[in-house]
Amino acid sequence: MLLGTGFEETEAIAPLDLLRRAGISVQTVGLNGSVIYGGHGIGVNADIEIGEMDLTALEMIILPGGLGGVASIRAYESAMNAVRFAWDNGKFVAAICAGPTVLADLGITAGKNATCYPGCEDGMGNAIIIPDSACIRDGNLITGTSAGCAVPFGLMLVEALKDKETADRIAQQIVIR
């Protein structure tokens, strides 16, 4: 999970929590150092910094939104290269809120069903925007709309990496209504 200064905290922490509840090993990757501050001033200790990332072990790369976080990802060539590597090697690529616009910059969303934060549609390139969807999976591409959709987005990531039964079990444990 790529974390750049100004990331949207809910869009990072909720999916991270759900993935770890599922027993999935997730590393948070700091782009601007080892402690990254989100858009609302919450500091997160990244597990590793971008230069330590092992792309060969990657199963999925996750981009939370937040305009500052998305700008940080775009500013780091190594982060953009990691996203491109994941996609080119058949790994899952997931992004929420403004994050999918980074994927569009790389041509990943072209011809794919996707969603994004309302108002970011112009930055989605040739994606097939599915309005009013919390999150969408199209093959190895997973996109989510906003912080308000962070839990369904996280459960979709669990389902992609594990299975529906695990995602359903976790949804039940956290009492999704």
What is each of the regions a protein language model found here?
Residues 11:
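Glycine-rich, flexible N-terminal cofactor/catalytic loop recognition
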Residues 1-3, 7, 21-31, 48-49, ...:
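Active-site-adjacent pocket-lining segments in enzyme domains
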Residues 29, 34-40:
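Membrane-interfacial amphipathic helices and adjacent loop/beta segments
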Residues 40-49:
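Short gly/ser/thr-rich secondary-structure transition/capping motifs
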Residues 14-21:
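Short, solvent-exposed amphipathic alpha-helices that sit
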